[in-house]
Amino acid sequence: QAGGGRIRAIWFASDDWKFDFNVSYDYTDEGGYPYYEVNFHEFSQKKEYDPIAYNRESSYRRSLLNTGLNIEHQADNFIFNAVTGFQHLNDRMFMDQDFTPLDYFTLEQNQRINSISEEITFKSKPGKNWQWTTGLFGFYQNMDVNAPVTFGKDIMNYFNRIMSSNIPINIEVPMGQGMAMHIMPSVNITTPEMNNDGRFKTPQHNVALFHQSQIHNLFEVEGLSFTLGLRLDYEKFKMKYNTGTPIDFNVSVKGEMSKNGEVIREIEMMPTTPLNIEARYKGNLSKDYIQLLPKFALQYDFNQGKDNVYISISKGYRSGGYNYQMFSNLIQYKLRNEMQEQSKKAIIEKAPKEYTEIVNEHFPTSGNIASLKDAVEYKPEYTWSYELGTHQSLFGGKLQTDLAIFYMSTKNQQISKMAISGLGRITENAGESESYGLEASLVANLN
């Protein structure tokens, strides 16, 4: 189901003032994410497509409102523009994110985004050798995301197997004369379905001041122009997060006395003990950036402005941010570590004293978890671009040619990839990259 509409109204208040208002609304409610597995056979070079098979709902619903107002004033020596924009987005997504009939995990994501922007510019009127534009830009966005993840019974069984592989299931203590004591700890998750709630608020502020000047007929050379642009950009990101989940599990320790490999006595060293932990992250992150972005260009027009050659240099910037999808990974690691620590502590407290040191020696210590900031934050991307090109009009305008060569150097390049947990896509910095290119086009008029 989908629907929407758009209204636009233009009012010429006078010869010098123009008001352009528009509003649009879009609504969609649909099923979604028909993913399936593709099996490729190397020898036959054939592909087999598995059927689409889900056990949970997959759908998407979105409500989107956009409004804008453009005010233009033609003064004697300049043109004034003020562009105001507002956007409201409210959506809900259900995704069976294992894409199989098994009950692994499903994601529900509810987003509410409100953003407002304002750009005010003053620019010169055409016809003079000095053409300029000066402006101020402001932007604010508040995004509120509620994204609980449900882990079903099949993935809980998998977690149990992982926990079993992380603890010693049989600690053998030789006792001489063919006798041995076998200490067998056991950890079993009893929570049938785990609900990992996730609430994230990410306000973003951006302010920029910019100016661009273009000088025509530079040094009194007709057709030669130079462009200089500067943009001072300030951005601030915040994220308020509250996400986590409790889990119930049992810990027990059994013992077996053996002689020459045969069990002669079973001992309950620690009765089944229920435990509960909660892995949760709650707090705030904040980061701000300030950048000066220059642009330089030199162009020479000839043949009555029909042909030109040019060179340009500019710096680009893509802001950083936060991947809230990474919290699922952190919570899984934290659950594993805390389960190991609590299990070890309970065994040491309740098992017979003569065996606690042995258990303490063989039980694994908790692994290291990446810092929250390092795990969820990605850095801004910076790019320097260089381009040399020409436009030629040949054979009386019957053949138009464009040729350009370019080079781009990017630092902290941002790429999109699936999170390790499989719960959504994340943005990650991939390091540095260089791009070289050649672009050519021909347009012929055969009339």
Language-model features: where?
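Outer-membrane beta-barrel and related beta-rich outer-membrane complex signature
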Residues: D20-Q45, Y49-P51, F86, R92-T100, ...
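Membrane-embedded beta-barrel scaffold of Gram-negative outer-membrane proteins
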Residues: N70-M95, N308-S312, Q325, K334-E428, ...
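Outer-membrane beta-barrel channels and translocator barrels
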Residues: F12-D16, A75-F78, K125-N129, L218-V221, ...
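Transmembrane beta-barrel wall of Gram-negative outer-membrane proteins
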Residues: Q1-E30, S63-L69, N114, E118, ...
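Residues on the lipid-exposed face of transmembrane beta-strands in outer-membrane beta-barrel proteins
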Residues: I7-W11, L69-H73, E118-S124, L209-I215, ...
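Extracellular loop and loop/strand-boundary signature of outer-membrane beta-barrel proteins
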Residues: I52-E57, D103-E108, S117, M194-F200, ...
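Transmembrane beta-barrel strands of outer-membrane/channel proteins
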Residues: F21-Y25, T84-F86, T134-Y140, L228-Y234, ...
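Signature of Gram-negative outer-membrane beta-barrel scaffolds
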Residues: G138-Q304, Q340-K344, V359-S371
